[in-house]
């Protein structure tokens, strides 16, 4: 177990506030960081920390153990990534457990629509609640669907996707029109000057749509990936790289400016990990296939195949 706040400030509060404590959320980001660090450096020290943490979570949560998911999804996609990278299927199985627990309120109080906990994910058809929570949950859902080849997760995924794309997405790719819940309201409620459009939500759109592409090979989701990379995400960062938007409204009376930092600085740190990873979205491989997913000046080498793109 690793959570500096709980361990140093409230050591008796482990797993006590699943709705708002963000323990599994933070664990998921640690796992993602560990995989990225090992890929970049070949060093496995942080990966071993993440593996031990995942083993602790697997010992505490699951059938016959704790059944409650985290109020802020993230652990789901991270466990699949850790499972793929380490070759340990039990982590992906734990991710599937957390996905299926969303909306199942056996022995606990529901987190409600805000955390997409109002209905089992396999029964959901509409995008609701907190935008970033939704993107991370459905990214994990797509990962689980791809890992286990589970079409029953892909069908609701695309029902939710259509509702989002057709009725609740701005022309910039921004999502989440309301600051009140940092998320969604009703269909076509897309005001310009009060648009919330959190930077992290656009990054979440990138993550989810890229995963839907990897799971299905569909090109329409790549249009969304491209829109987020060119529009939804960059607006959150000043050209000098030293000031940030948390929300990205489409209109301003001059009173909305980028700032150096926030009390809750998820957006700057999310940008810091996203921009260096753009290369991973350009190409993909499948059985006897090589996909060019984005038109970008790039080069790819894979075994006997070399591609050069000057777009």
Annotated model-derived regions:
Residues 1-309:
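Glycan-recognition and catalytic cores of secretory/periplasmic carbohydrate-active enzymes
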